[in-house]
Curated annotation (Swiss-Prot):
Matches recorded under Pfam families: AIM24
Name the record gives this protein: Altered inheritance of mitochondria protein 24, mitochondrial
Alphabetical list of InterPro entries matching this protein: AIM24, AIM24_sf, Trp_RNA-bd_attenuator-like_dom
Keyword terms: Mitochondrion, Transit peptide
Family membership: Belongs to the AIM24 family.
Amino acid sequence: MSIPKTFSQVSRRSISLVRPTATTLVPTEAELKTATQTNAEELFDDDDAKKPISTTKFQVLGQPATMASLIVPPSIPLYVRRGCLVSLHGAEKLSMNYEWVHFWSNLIHYRSIKPSIYHKLVSTSKFNALVAPNFLSNRIGPWLGLSSSPFRTLCLLNLNGSADWNVWGQDSVVAYENNSSLSVQPPNPFLIRLRSQAFSSKYQTVQGRGNVLLSGSGSVYTVDLKDAKDEIIIRSEHLLAVSGANRREITNAITEQKLSPPPEMTRKVPSEAGRFFESIRELDGRLFWDSSKAVGIKFWNWTRRIYSRLINGPTKYLKIQGPRTLLIQSSYNVYLPASPINRNSVEQQWAKPDSLAQNPSKNYFNYASVSTNGNVEFEATPNFNETVKKIEESGNKKR
């Protein structure tokens, strides 16, 4: 199929990335005053609004880039994830409806229908749209102590047909134009099971010509691998997208890097479970309580890790070989356990005030001695060997 001449204006691939800074996270009073005087018409260029266009124009806004401006020509469908559409401007006759995109594939990969629900926008005239990465959060995760990335930023992917992209994550593709030369397709879930892959199959392949708006966890950066000798090792959760000649070539360029622990870390140490059963045998109340608390904490942390593994898959270190371009995100692309609970944190929460704190005693048993004159004396001892010896000696004297 021949490519229209209108696409000849796009001569190279460009990726717009924005690094968030601390100064822009909290706006000043002057910035807030300026923002209150801005309306939707002033957000876009008036000259561009009057000019007819034949191709879409995507532009990220702000620092960090938490919003994007999309200018769409007439009769070009625009797909936007549900919940990410902020506003529309200049659309006289607009058709908007829900569209299920790759329903069965997303249901198998992510066990959710949310990644499949898109707004499909088509207008008879040019219109402007504002889009933000407003995804619904996981409701079960926070209850289990799981946390998602603190914020998501946008980056623009403009394709000219020279390379394909594999994009990972169920919330990575925010919006894209549905022209005849742009394709956004997930892999076939049944064919993937027939061959092993080094990394997750939860990705979408973007190929052709057009604009795609991506969302990454935290800030998004590019890494350019110049040639076949250039390679990088990256933690799998931070990988957002990889370019290549085609889907198979990208898959073959990614291999798993095995990281073996140091020899001293492989030595076996007594576990908390061992101390737990040891305390039961010795009938040691203090040791039994400490061991039970430690076992409970370890079990809770283990439950959260298992839940995270079921959702996200195992953590891997990936070796990626060039030449290609990578998109790296600073935060995780998945739900991960928050900081694991440890014994020290629990003890600090329940620690007594300094005025009431006492030095820990090495003895575990207290007993009282009543003399013939009625005096009572309390003593502490690790065992009753010495007391039993005194009783035996006093009994021998009476004999």
